[in-house]
Amino acid sequence: MKRENLHQPFEISFSELDESLLKEHEHTFFELVYILSGTGIQWINNNMFPYHDGHLFMITPGDTHSFEIHTTTKFVDIKFNDIYIHSSVFGAENIQRLEFILQHANHQPGCILRNKVDKLLVKPMIEAIIREYINRNLYSKEIITQIINTIIIVVARNIAMFLPEQVDECSEDKSLDILQYIQANIYKNR
């Protein structure tokens, strides 16, 4: 199986496809895939989900996925890695919270935008990224970066809203403490 890597903090790409070029593969990074137009099926970790315009998918590191295209589909891909999340753009106090929430995205197949208001919010942001990317005006890179940051936060909100247990300051901190303890001690005494 093909495994993709990302060698920069984030990358944006646009494509229009009549058929799937990439078969089942996995990443070492996060990927947001926005469907501008088209229909088909997204396969992720052996689960399928029909897609159409306006859907946003979150693919986390280690997920196995592919797209089965039924009608010509326009994709916007936003790829980012842990380096991007740990950069100063999100602020030190938000990094652990954001990372925790994003890592839980793989438990939620299908369109990540479940809040109707956020669906209406994300579409013009994606369109703004496309305009800035094509026109390359003064400060375009900075504007794109800020829009990506906002989309990531909107995605995190949608994930947090539908986690199995309510994520609040206490439950999230406890979960993080448990995960950190396990990670730090899993290979001790072996």
Predicted regions and their residues:
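Conserved short histidine dyad/triad with adjacent acidic residue
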Residues: 11-27
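Short acidic-glycine-tyrosine-enriched beta hairpin
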Residues: 46-58
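Short, conserved beta-strand element in jelly-roll/cupin
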Residues: 26-43, 58
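Short beta-strand His + acidic residue motifs that chelate non-heme Fe in jelly-roll/DSBH
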Residues: 41-43, 59, 64-71
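A cytosolic small-molecule/anion-sensing beta-strand core signal
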Residues: 36, 52-53, 61, 71
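A hydrophobic/aromatic-rich effector-binding and dimerization subdomain
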Residues: 1-11, 68-131
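Tight coil/turn sites that cap or link beta-strands
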Residues: 19, 53-54, 62, 81
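Short, Lys/Arg-enriched, Trp-marked, Pro/Gly-tolerant hinge/linker segments that flank
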Residues: 108-117, 133-147, 153-189
